[in-house]
A protein has these predicted regions:
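Conserved acetyl-CoA-binding loop of GNAT-fold acetyltransferases
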Residues: 130-138
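Conserved GNAT acetyl-CoA-binding A-motif
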Residues: 106-118
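Acetyl-CoA-dependent GNAT
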Residues: 2-88, 99-101, 105, 140-141, ...
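A generic structural signal for beta-strand entry/edge sites
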Residues: 75-77, 113, 145-147
């Protein structure tokens, strides 16, 4: 059973556990294999509607982090800002299940599209999101990192 718990500063250690189970991503994004509480705290300080972030628990264990933005002020579109599954929970269909729940909610709200960004070098993410029906629409640079913008129309 999946429980979505709204994230915030009180969830730093839960997020840290999930993040540090994925050193590949941390290396790409942060330039180091392990993140520290302050790295996560910086992310969490900016979370306010229409941006939402959750720690997802499965059978009481930290299983994933998911973040979405219902209305990006830059393009007016909803964005999936972050989805990370704890290493121990990967390859079990959890990412697909979480994404599908998000897509279903967006459909109910009559959003016709969803966007997300993938860092250059994140081959597993390219593969996963392509399988979910997303297509690359452009490449941008943010803070010195190339980000591939993907979009899916519903």
């Amino acid at each position: 059973m999946l429980i979505w718990e709204q994230s915030g500063l009180e969830k730093v250690m839960d997020e840290l556990e999930i993040m540090n189970s994925n050193p590949f991503y941390n290396e790409l994004f942060y330039g180091k294999g392990k993140v520290e509480p302050k790295d996560i705290m910086e992310e969490l300080l900016d979370i306010k509607p229409p941006r939402f972030r959750y720690v997802v628990k499965e059978y009481g264990k930290n299983a994933a982090i998911i973040e979405y933005l219902l209305h990006n002020p830059k393009d007016g579109k909803p964005w999936l800002g972050f989805l990370m599954v704890a290493k121990a929970c990967q390859n079990q269909g959890l990412a697909k299940k979480l994404y599908t729940e998000c897509e279903n909610e967006l459909r109910k709200m009559k959003h016709p599209v969803l966007r997300l960004g993938i860092l250059t070098g994140n081959a597993p993410a390219f593969s996963f999101w392509s399988r979910m029906g997303f297509r690359e629409i452009e490449i941008k640079e943010n803070e010195g990192k190339k980000i591939h913008i993907f979009e899916k129309q519903f």
